[in-house]
């Protein structure tokens, strides 16, 4: 009757490499392994110890079960990825022109004063603000200013001028970012009707 219900079940006593661990456990528990012609007594003792413990040296023992790498190799690959990223940044910075290098250094050094950001946020919200929120807001403000400055530099380059950024370039950059919907609304609202 088992042959009808389970037609894929093999009657051989030998185990192939593709068999599951559960199948090995059940066959060793039922005593079918003792009748095997291919195993020698030395391997039976080792195999009995492995089956009784449930351990198998050929299987993954790191506990996550989803990959074949141990946990210490995953940490190593994460460290390697961080090191590769650092090397890429070093190559990129080494290929900067003098102007780009100065701009990059100023960007790295620049930050909004946290006390001023905290005071501004507390006056707007009317409640106390934690230090983590202040750090996040100063980072967001730095990214926002970076986008405006980048767009202003594009405007200046498109108009064929060079030198320091002037207010007219920054105003044009803000206007362009508003038309691209990449600028928060703030006080500026587009008119509902246009009279032309």
UniProtKB/Swiss-Prot annotation:
Q: Name one GO cellular component term.
A: transcription factor TFIID complex
The domain of life is: Eukaryota
Its subcellular locations are:
Nucleus; Cytoplasm; Cytoplasm, Cytoplasmic ribonucleoprotein granule
Q: Name one GO molecular function term.
A: protein heterodimerization activity
What segments bear the compositional bias annotation Polar residues?
7-16
GO biological process terms, semicolon-separated: protein-RNA complex assembly; RNA polymerase II preinitiation complex assembly; RNAi-mediated antiviral immune response; transcription initiation at RNA polymerase II promoter
First-listed, main subcellular location of the protein, grouped into a coarse class = nucleus
Which terms are listed as keywords in the entry?
Cytoplasm, Nucleus, Phosphoprotein, Transcription, Transcription regulation
| Phosphoserine PTM positions | 14, 16
Checking InterPro entries in the record gives: Histone-fold, TAF11-like, TAFII28_dom
Q: Where is this region: Disordered?
A: 1-88
Q: What does this protein do?
A: The TFIID basal transcription factor complex plays a major role in the initiation of RNA polymerase II (Pol II)-dependent transcription. TFIID recognizes and binds promoters with or without a TATA box via its subunit TBP, a TATA-box-binding protein, and promotes assembly of the pre-initiation complex (PIC).
Its assembly, as annotated, is: Belongs to the TFIID complex which is composed of TATA binding protein (Tbp) and a number of TBP-associated factors (TAFs). Interacts with Taf2 and Taf4. Component of the RISC loading complex (siRLC), composed of at least Dcr-2, r2d2 and Taf11, which loads duplex siRNA onto AGO2 to initiate formation of the RNA-induced silencing complex (siRISC). Interacts with Dcr-2, r2d2 and AGO2. Taf11 appears to form a tetramer which facilitates or stabilizes formation of the Dcr-2-r2d2 heterotetramer.
What does the similarity note say? Belongs to the TAF11 family.
What is this protein's record name? Answer: Transcription initiation factor TFIID subunit 11
Recall the taxonomic lineage recorded for the source organism: Eukaryota, Metazoa, Ecdysozoa, Arthropoda, Hexapoda
> Gene name?
Taf11
């Amino acid at each position: 009757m088992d042959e009808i219900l389970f037609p894929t079940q093999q009657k051989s006593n030998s185990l192939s490499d593709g068999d599951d661990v559960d199948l090995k456990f059940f066959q060793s528990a039922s005593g079918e392994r003792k009748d095997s012609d291919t195993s020698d007594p030395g391997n039976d003792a080792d195999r009995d110890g492995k089956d009784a413990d449930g351990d198998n040296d050929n299987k993954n023992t790191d506990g996550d079960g989803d990959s074949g790498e141990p946990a210490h190799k995953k940490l190593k690959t994460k460290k390697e990825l961080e090191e590769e990223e650092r090397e890429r940044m070093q190559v990129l910075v080494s290929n900067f022109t003098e102007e780009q290098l100065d701009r990059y250094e100023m960007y790295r050094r620049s930050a909004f004063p946290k006390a001023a950001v905290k005071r501004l946020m507390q006056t707007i919200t009317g409640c106390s603000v934690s230090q983590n929120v202040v750090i996040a807001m100063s980072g967001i403000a730095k990214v926002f200013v970076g986008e405006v400055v980048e767009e202003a530099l594009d405007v200046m380059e498109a108009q064929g001028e060079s030198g320091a950024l002037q207010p007219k370039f920054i105003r044009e950059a803000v206007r362009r970012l508003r038309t691209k919907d990449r600028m928060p609304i703030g006080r500026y609202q587009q008119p509902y009707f246009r009279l032309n």
